[in-house]
């Protein structure tokens, strides 16, 4: 499987307009691209007028053909003007979903944007976070506007919006190259999916008036109207969805279900990286967030190490898990940049991560990764000599190099970021061990060890391996993993280490004081003992010396017995969990015969979940990388907004996935 896409091949004509070499067509009008956007798409969908009467907190636009981003810039600017003029309006956020088969190179984007200096700030932000050439959804935040940029063929990506997005899109920009130039895109499958995902009274607008396009949209169910065309074009089309068509859910057992809220009152149980990232995404949407942490301070468990590596898990045999981590890695870097911009202080270094082929098994894994066709800034195989140069110390093996990898101080990051969130209104309650959850008519009651009770509309469980302590979650197939990370003094040799070094363990570069490194970590499943282990301390040292087998490794000295033990939460398939908490007993009753229900094509119930109860779990050893995108995904689900991941990834992260796989095979779930 490949995860990458190709760049667009373009040139600029005499009018300085970009022209596609693949499709032999201009990206926007030779006359006035911005005026065309305004007339065809903004006016064609009557956006300003509809925003005035809109009663929901978010408005969703989808677009075929991102191109230079001109349409996105124009609608983002218009929405900013709307928000400035209507500060107290219920409409707060704009979601813009766009599909692009051949993304432009950064240099081409820059040149194309020179014609529109009024979008200079938007252009700079887009260029800063312009994604690597990875298939799928890339979420980029522009204040109150969120861009979901899907790289790849729209015929493959649009279905990946999935059942969740049925009737959630308010307006369509049906753009792209002309039907005569790109006939593969303009087809009935596209029109039918557009209709399926469009809300009742949702609209579309397009620059073309081609007869086949009009008939296809009408056949899908839209009421189509001809308008005067822009410039020299005689006509263009717009349309309205008046009546719904019932659409059978393809995977009802995985359907994500938003919260039912009036006050946006959310409790998060847990005090680590998962809780933090969920809180960040929630407060951006206006939620009132309360954190319940059982420890006396935040980030004392799995998120409490002094140094941790930030890089994607690419060696999984499950392509959907790899796909998730590729996008989580990109989104996580965006969150770290946001934290730096907010002056949240935490030690970090964007130094790259080296993955050593220290034995035959690891060499095979890295070779498989190299065959995924990933961009070089994500992964590339290097010789021992090349890798040694990157690392700063001699190695005797080849390996993988992740240029954008980093290390950061997890505890410092979590604690200081939470301090920042407190100033934004987040309430933090430490020394609050929640022992029971009781469902109310509207929300949940939380009970602590002292018998005190708290009520909230929505509850998120993000308390690591203790997530199964509740009656509602005790059936989830999660387990704890003990890990001891050693802190070692630096030396003249170790100070030369320039990147994170991974083998059957990991070693970080020196901290910012240049006094110590972290090396780890032991792994013991179903072990929650937090006591220091001298044996594990020695094993952390021995693994490095055995795997790397270079003289400089003898400088590693764990005899000070400085170490930290944390308990991670994991699951057998090693993918995280995010979303609704499934109601096991009800799902067991609904799906025990799922194999036969599907075979007989009988009606199947949507997943029975606990209303307004959600989770982020099983982050394992990659929480720094996965938590930001998991938190953003969960906030999107809670608010009923478009998701930053594909339907396939969502299914792979669903908490009931292990049960469903058995039910689909006709097997029992105990």
UniProtKB/Swiss-Prot annotation:
- Residue ranges of the region described as tRNA (mnm(5)s(2)U34)-methyltransferase: 1-242
- Give positions of region: FAD-dependent cmnm(5)s(2)U34 oxidoreductase: 269-670
EC number(s)? 2.1.1.61, 1.5.-.-
Q: Which Pfam families match?
A: DAO, Methyltransf_30
Q: Which cofactor does it need?
A: FAD
Q: Does the keyword Transmembrane helix apply?
A: no
What UniProt keywords are attached to this protein's entry? Cytoplasm, FAD, Flavoprotein, Methyltransferase, Multifunctional enzyme, Oxidoreductase, S-adenosyl-L-methionine, Transferase, tRNA processing
Gene Ontology CC = cytoplasm
Compartments annotated for it: namely: Cytoplasm
Any GO BP annotation:
tRNA wobble uridine modification
Taxonomy, superkingdom: Bacteria
Q: What GO molecular-function term can you cite, just one? A: oxidoreductase activity, acting on the CH-NH group of donors
Reactions catalysed: 5-aminomethyl-2-thiouridine(34) in tRNA + S-adenosyl-L-methionine = 5-methylaminomethyl-2-thiouridine(34) in tRNA + S-adenosyl-L-homocysteine + H(+)
Record keyword Acetylation present? no
* The protein's role, per its UniProt record: Catalyzes the last two steps in the biosynthesis of 5-methylaminomethyl-2-thiouridine (mnm(5)s(2)U) at the wobble position (U34) in tRNA. Catalyzes the FAD-dependent demodification of cmnm(5)s(2)U34 to nm(5)s(2)U34, followed by the transfer of a methyl group from S-adenosyl-L-methionine to nm(5)s(2)U34, to form mnm(5)s(2)U34.
Q: Which family does it belong to?
A: In the N-terminal section; belongs to the methyltransferase superfamily. tRNA (mnm(5)s(2)U34)-methyltransferase family.
Protein name as annotated: tRNA 5-methylaminomethyl-2-thiouridine biosynthesis bifunctional protein MnmC
Q: Which organism is it from?
A: Haemophilus influenzae (strain ATCC 51907 / DSM 11121 / KW20 / Rd)
Encoding gene (name):
mnmC
């Amino acid at each position: 499987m490949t995860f990458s896409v190709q760049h667009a091949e373009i040139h600029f004509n005499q009018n300085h307009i970009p022209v596609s070499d693949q499709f032999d067509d201009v990206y926007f009008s030779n006359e006035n691209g911005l005026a065309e956007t305004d007339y065809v798409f903004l006016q064609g969908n009557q956006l300003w007028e509809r925003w005035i009467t809109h009663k929901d907190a978010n408005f969703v636009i989808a677009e075929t053909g991102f191109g230079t981003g001109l349409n996105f810039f124009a609608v983002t600017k218009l929405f900013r003007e709307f928000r400035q003029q209507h500060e107290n309006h219920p409409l707060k956020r704009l979601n813009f979903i766009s599909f692009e088969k051949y993304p432009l190179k950064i240099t081409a984007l820059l040149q194309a944007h020179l014609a529109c200096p009024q979008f200079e700030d938007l252009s700079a932000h887009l260029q800063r976070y312009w994604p690597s050439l990875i298939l799928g959804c890339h979420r980029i935040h522009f204040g109150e506007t969120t861009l979901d940029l899907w790289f790849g063929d729209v015929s493959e990506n649009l279905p990946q919006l999935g059942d969740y997005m049925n009737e959630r899109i308010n307006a369509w920009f049906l753009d792209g190259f002309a039907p005569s130039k790109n006939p593969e895109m303009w087809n009935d499958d596209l029109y039918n999916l557009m209709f399926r995902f469009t809300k009742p009274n949702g609209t579309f607008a397009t620059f073309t008036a081609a007869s086949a396009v009009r008939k296809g949209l009408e056949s899908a169910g839209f009421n189509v109207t001809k308008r005067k065309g822009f410039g020299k074009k005689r006509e263009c089309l717009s349309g309205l969805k008046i009546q719904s068509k019932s659409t059978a859910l393809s995977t009802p057992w995985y359907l994500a279900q938003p919260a039912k809220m009036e006050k946006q009152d959310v409790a998060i149980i847990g005090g680590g990286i998962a809780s933090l990232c969920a809180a960040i995404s929630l407060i951006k949407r206006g939620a009132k967030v309360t954190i319940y942490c059982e420890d006396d301070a935040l980030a004392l468990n799995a998120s409490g190490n002094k140094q941790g590596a930030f890089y994607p898990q690419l060696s999984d045999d499950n392509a959907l898990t790899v796909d998730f981590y590729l996008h989580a890695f990109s989104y996580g870097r965006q969150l770290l940049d946001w934290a730096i911009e907010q002056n949240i202080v935490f030690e970090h270094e964007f130094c790259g991560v080296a993955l050593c082929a220290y034995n035959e098994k690891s060499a095979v894994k890295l070779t498989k990764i190299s065959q995924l066709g990933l961009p070089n800034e994500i992964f590339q195989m290097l010789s021992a000599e090349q890798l040694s140069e990157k690392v700063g110390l001699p190695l005797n093996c080849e390996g993988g190099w992740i240029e954008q990898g980093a290390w950061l101080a997890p505890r410092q990051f979590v604690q200081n970021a939470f301090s920042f969130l407190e100033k934004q209104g987040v309430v933090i309650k430490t020394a609050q061990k929640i022992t029971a959850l009781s469902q109310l008519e509207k929300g949940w009651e939380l009970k602590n060890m002292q018998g005190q009770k708290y009520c909230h509309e929505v509850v998120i469980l993000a308390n690591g391996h203790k997530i199964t302590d509740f009656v509602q979650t005790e059936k989830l197939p999660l387990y704890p993993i003990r890990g001891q990370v050693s802190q070692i003094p630096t030396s003249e040799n170790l100070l030369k280490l320039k990147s994170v070094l991974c083998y059957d363990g990991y070693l970080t570069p020196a901290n910012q004081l240049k006094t110590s490194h972290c090396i780890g970590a032991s792994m013991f499943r179903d072990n929650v003992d937090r006591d220091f282990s001298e044996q594990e301390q020695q094993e952390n040292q021995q693994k490095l010396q055995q795997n790397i087998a270079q003289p400089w490794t003898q400088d590693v000295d764990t005899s000070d017995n400085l170490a930290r033990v944390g308990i991670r939460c994991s699951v057998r398939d090693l993918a995280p969990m995010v979303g609704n908490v499934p109601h096991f007993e009800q799902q067991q009753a609904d799906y025990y015969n799922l194999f036969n229900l599907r075979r007989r094509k009988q009606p199947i119930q949507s997943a029975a979940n606990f209303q307004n109860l959600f989770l982020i779990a099983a982050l394992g050893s990659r929480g720094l990388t996965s938590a930001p995108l998991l938190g953003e995904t969960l906030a999107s689900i809670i608010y009923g907004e478009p998701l930053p991941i594909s339907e396939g990834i969502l299914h792979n992260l669903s908490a009931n996935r292990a049960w469903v796989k058995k039910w689909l095979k006709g097997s029992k779930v105990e």
